[in-house]
Regions:
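Transmembrane-helix boundary and interhelical linker motifs in polytopic inner-membrane proteins
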Residues: 3-4, 32-38, 50-87, 133-142
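Transmembrane helix-loop junctions in multipass membrane proteins, especially transporters and channels
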Residues: 29, 33-36, 62-66, 101-106, ...
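Conserved glycine-rich helix-kink/hinge and helix-boundary motifs of the Major Facilitator Superfamily
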Residues: 10, 14, 132, 136, ...
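Signature of the first transmembrane helix
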Residues: 5-61, 94, 98, 120, ...
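Membrane-interface helix-capping segments at transmembrane helix termini in multi-pass transporters
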Residues: 33-45, 70-81, 91-122, 164-172, ...
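Transmembrane alpha-helical segments that form the membrane-embedded catalytic/substrate-channel core
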Residues: 55-56, 122-130, 183-185
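Interhelical loop/hinge segments that connect adjacent transmembrane helices in multipass membrane
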Residues: 1-6, 141, 145, 168-169, ...
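Hydrophobic alpha-helical transmembrane segments
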Residues: 111-118, 145-192, 208-212
Length: 230
C-alpha cells in the first residue's frame, strides 16, 4: 500500500465507525427515554452477544490478517475454511446461550431478545473474516460500503420501532437485521459461496493453526464473564 493512501484508508475506517456510533447513540438515547428497563434488557442481550462473537471468532482474525498479508495461502480458499469453522462455533455458542438463559430463569421473551442480538453478533464474528481480507488488501473502501448501509438500515429500523412504540421483541431485531445485511453484502462482494469445499479436513487443518488464538479467546471470554458478574 502506498504511503499517500494511508490517510484515505484511515478515513474509510473512521467514517464507518463514526456513522455507526452516531446512529447507535441516537438509538440508545431514545430507548432510554422511553423505558430504562428496556434499555437494561438490551444491555443484558448485548453482553451475551459479545460472548457469542468472541467464541465465534476463536482467535482466527489475527491469523487471517497475518496470513493474508504474507500471501502464503489462497485467500478465498482460506476465507471459506475459516468462515465455515466460525459458523460452527457460532451455532454451538447460540445453543449454549439459549440453555444458559433458561437456566438463569430469564423470561421466554428475554431469551428470544438475547437470541436475536447474540445471533447478530455471531454473524459479525463470521463476517469479520471477509473484512480481514479487505484490510490486508488495503480495501477499506469496500468494508465501508458494506458496514455503513448495514448499520444505517439495521439501527434505523430500531429507531423507527422505538419512536413508533413497538414492543421490545421487535426492537431487538435491529441487530439481526444489521448483521444479516452485512453478511449478505459481504458474500455479494466476495462473488462466491465461501462454504463451497468446506469439510472435516479443513476443520482439522485449521484446528492446528488456531491453537494459540484459542487461548486468547478463553481469556477474553473470562474477562467478559468477570465484568458481567461485577
Amino acid at each position: 500500500m502506498k504511503l499517500k493512501s494511508l490517510p484515505r484508508q484511515l478515513g474509510y475506517i473512521l467514517g464507518a465507525q463514526w456513522t455507526r456510533d452516531l446512529s447507535w447513540t441516537i438509538f440508545t438515547i431514545l430507548l432510554a427515554r422511553r423505558s430504562p428497563e428496556m434499555l437494561g434488557q438490551i444491555a443484558v442481550a448485548l453482553s451475551c452477544g459479545y460472548l457469542v462473537k468472541t467464541v465465534s471468532d476463536v482467535g482466527l482474525n489475527d491469523f487471517l490478517l497475518s496470513t493474508f498479508a504474507r500471501r502464503e495461502e489462497r485467500p478465498r480458499t482460506l476465507l471459506g475454511e475459516v468462515t465455515g469453522l466460525k459458523t460452527c462455533f457460532m451455532m454451538l455458542a447460540l445453543i449454549v446461550t439459549w440453555f444458559v438463559t433458561g437456566w438463569l430463569g430469564y423470561s421466554f421473551e428475554l431469551r428470544l431478545i438475547v437470541l436475536f442480538i447474540a445471533t447478530g453478533f455471531g454473524l459479525d464474528g463470521v463476517t469479520d473474516s471477509f473484512f480481514a481480507l479487505c484490510q490486508a488488501r488495503g480495501r477499506q473502501d469496500v468494508e465501508m460500503r458494506i458496514r455503513v448501509p448495514s448499520a444505517l438500515l439495521g439501527i434505523g429500523y430500531g429507531i423507527v420501532c422505538v419512536v413508533a412504540g413497538a414492543p421490545l421483541i421487535f426492537i431487538a431485531l435491529y441487530k439481526l437485521i444489521e448483521s444479516v445485511l452485512c453478511t449478505g453484502f459481504a458474500f455479494r462482494a466476495l462473488g462466491r459461496n465461501p462454504f463451497v469445499g468446506f469439510g472435516y479436513d479443513n476443520v482439522r487443518d485449521l484446528a492446528v493453526k488456531m491453537k494459540s488464538g484459542f487461548i486468547f479467546t478463553i481469556l477474553a471470554a473470562c474477562a467478559l464473564f468477570y465484568n458481567k458478574i461485577n
